[in-house]
């Protein structure tokens, strides 16, 4: 079972060479980390287990996303990356997992970790096996070429799309993922929460609203993050994935570090109506 790319040629370049150059551009951009990381040949104990990464078109959010992938790649090739994304299409279940096969992009195919995927379905009470939610969803797909650029086909993924974004759902998810990470202690597992921040307001307003959410992220306050999103109308699309990694960070005693915060106005130059982007690592 192969999932074909839904947004190649739109959110990112549709040809292999152009896509590789676009990823390199993201790292070397003034808003990016400034250099392309080297993947170490030998594995060592991973410091940063969890990340928040944006998922817009690479021309807008690629440089911000590159900060997270700089740390991820610098610590070696992970065995499995669990990617949590919000559901923008309305298709599928409340929480939908793609169970097996491969995902295809212009950089090739990446394999699903079927063993961990099926164990996650068993361990978490809220995850359904449901491919429909993934067919046209971009929030997970745009993370895959970054992984392929550095790790080729040596890394496997577990894609999970969340439509019902509540603290309770995130609690179940975090508990299930935590059990899996403890069960497979010999495996190098990383979790990515895919989310953009506030949408379609002026640059200054977006920075102000994003900072309210970032304050809760830095205190690992997942319920506070939910309340800010609901009460202050901070239109971060992936607050469910973010709440989940905040809980995981607390369970595994990892601290949050903001790597980069910017908006689409910083890359496009148009600051009248922007989207906020945030890269966070959770490590020691």
UniProtKB/Swiss-Prot annotation:
InterPro entries reported for this sequence: MEMO1_fam (IPR002737)
Annotated S-S bridges: none
PANTHER family registered for this protein in UniProt: PROTEIN MEMO1
Family to which this protein belongs: Belongs to the MEMO1 family.
NCBIfam families linked to this entry: AmmeMemoSam_B (TIGR04336)
This protein's name: MEMO1 family protein STK_20620
Organism for this UniProt entry: Sulfurisphaera tokodaii (strain DSM 16993 / JCM 10545 / NBRC 100140 / 7) (Sulfolobus tokodaii)
């Amino acid at each position: 079972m192969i999932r074909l790319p839904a947004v190649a040629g739109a959110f990112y370049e549709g040809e292999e060479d152009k896509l590789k150059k676009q990823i390199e551009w993201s790292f070397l951009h003034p808003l990016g980390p400034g250099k392309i990381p080297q993947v170490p040949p030998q594995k060592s104990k991973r410091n940063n287990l969890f990340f928040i990464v944006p998922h817009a078109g690479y021309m807008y959010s690629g440089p911000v996303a590159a900060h997270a992938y700089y740390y991820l790649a610098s610590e070696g090739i992970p065995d499995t990356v669990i990617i949590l994304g919000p559901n923008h299409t309305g298709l599928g279940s409340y929480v939908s997992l793609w169970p097996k096969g491969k995902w295809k992009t212009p950089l090739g195919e990446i394999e699903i970790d079927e063993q961990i995927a099926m164990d996650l379905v068993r361990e978490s009470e809220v995850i359904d096996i449901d491919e429909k939610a993934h067919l046209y969803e971009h929030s997970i797909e745009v993370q895959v070429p970054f992984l392929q650029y550095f790790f080729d086909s040596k890394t496997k993924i577990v894609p999970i799309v969340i439509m019902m974004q509540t603290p309770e759902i995130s609690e179940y998810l975090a508990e299930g993922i935590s059990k899996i990470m403890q069960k497979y202690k010999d495996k190098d597992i990383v979790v990515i929460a895919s989310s953009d921040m506030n949408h379609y307001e002026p640059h200054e307003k977006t920075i102000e609203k994003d900072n309210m959410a970032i304050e809760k992220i830095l205190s690992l306050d997942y319920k506070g993050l939910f309340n800010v999103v609901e009460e202050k109308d901070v239109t971060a699309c992936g607050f469910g994935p973010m709440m989940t990694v905040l809980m995981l960070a607390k369970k595994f005693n990892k601290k949050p570090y903001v790597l980069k915060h910017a908006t689409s106005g910083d890359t496009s130059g148009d600051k009248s109506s922007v989207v906020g982007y945030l890269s966070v690592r959770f490590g020691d």
